[in-house]
Amino acid sequence: MAAGAAACPEAEELEADFENTENNNNTNRIFMKKGTVIAIAVVALIAIWSVAAYNGLVSKEENVKKAWSQVENQYQRRSDLIPNLVATVKGYASHESQTLQEVTEARASATRITVDTDNLTPEAMLAYQDAQGQVGAALGRLLMIQESYPELKANQNFLELQTQLEGTENRISVERKRFNEEAQIYNTSLRRFPQNIIAGITGFVPKPYFESNDGSDQAPTVEF
């Protein structure tokens, strides 16, 4: 009996140790489960944030592309006016051949320069802006011819074309400004943390701006 009684405390101690071990294991499993849940939640949040940041950059870049399309549309509108304008001036000032040729050649050169909105580099922007500037300067010289030709100045078709040209120049200015605004919004997003990380990984690059000018690339307004 004494031996059996002595064994009981040892058995109870072993049982207590076993229970403590089980409790510790259960606690560890709970912590592991919590840690796993937290890790999954963190990964999910990062994934959601990454997708949102990427989609935001895509949206802003699309706005830049849309703004660029409007710029091109207005420059194309101006280009479409040139043949009729040249033909009208030629009817009254045919010997102004050099000026007429300059306008025609500037238009042809500008038409050959296209810009890929997916690769809108500063070099491409500069080449495009320079070509359009040459057109504007040539048109300015062409319009000044009317001062020497009263009949041309009074021609109704010429007056209508000049009105359309002036309206187009105004729209060009508006769309250029809008493009710069959209490009600035996009470029600012690229520099901000943490979008700059997503931009670096996914290949988003800054967009160039239209440079401000003194109006030398625009056809002047001539008072009648």
Regions found by a protein language model. Give the residues of each.
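A helix-centric hydrophobic-segment signal that preferentially recognizes long
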Residues: 17-22, 26-224
